[in-house]
Amino acid sequence: MKTIEVDDELYSYIASHTKHIGESASDILRRMLKFSAASQPAAPVTKEVRVASPAIVEAKPVKTIKDKVRAMRELLLSDEYAEQKRAVNRFMLLLSTLYSLDAQAFAEATESLHGRTRVYFAADEQTLLKNGNQTKPKHVSGTPYWVITNTNTGRKCSMIEHIMLSMQFPAELIEKVCGTI
């Protein structure tokens, strides 16, 4: 077994082709390259991988639900997420990531998300402040959205749950994400 270094983008692409838990990188690459261990010696594999790599990087235009799930799992395992000491910071990072995965679905989810007397998301800070001076609005990084942040962790979880359900994430992932806030 040899070790090779790949950049993050290529790693993510290869990981996005995982078919089952525990599948090795070698198995994934063999399947992607339609290569079997018995058919050719090791040297041509290296050549084949190098030729195929540029095509792999370019062939990543649309995010499927599997890609979105993988991206959320990668976020939960990331150092950036682990370094967040406060629930509000994890909440903000989750919102930013969800938006980056599918801006349209995120927009649709947030439009239907509001409390009895409160608006949770808006395009500007003033709209949120109109619904209460103590809402502590914060801008969601990388998005046109502002969100109120003076809610308890349970409310933050239910907001994330609503958005993820609307974006058609699997229930077990939603539960896992909410458990980390």
UniProtKB/Swiss-Prot annotation:
Annotated localization: Cytoplasm
Similarity section: Belongs to the SeqA family.
UniProt-recorded name of the protein: Negative modulator of initiation of replication
Keywords of this entry: Cytoplasm, DNA replication inhibitor, DNA-binding
Source organism per UniProt: Shigella dysenteriae serotype 1 (strain Sd197)
Xref: SUPFAM superfamilies: Replication modulator SeqA, C-terminal DNA-binding domain, Ribbon-helix-helix
The keyword Metal-binding is assigned to this record: no
GO biological process, one term: negative regulation of DNA-templated DNA replication initiation
Residues covered by region (Interaction with DNA): 87-88, 116-120, 150-156
Listed GO CC annotations: cytoplasm
Pfam families on file: SeqA, SeqA_N
HAMAP family named in the record: SeqA
Gene3D superfamilies reported in the protein's UniProt record: Met repressor-like, Replication modulator SeqA, C-terminal DNA-binding domain
Keyword check for Cytoplasm: yes
Chief location bin: cytoplasm
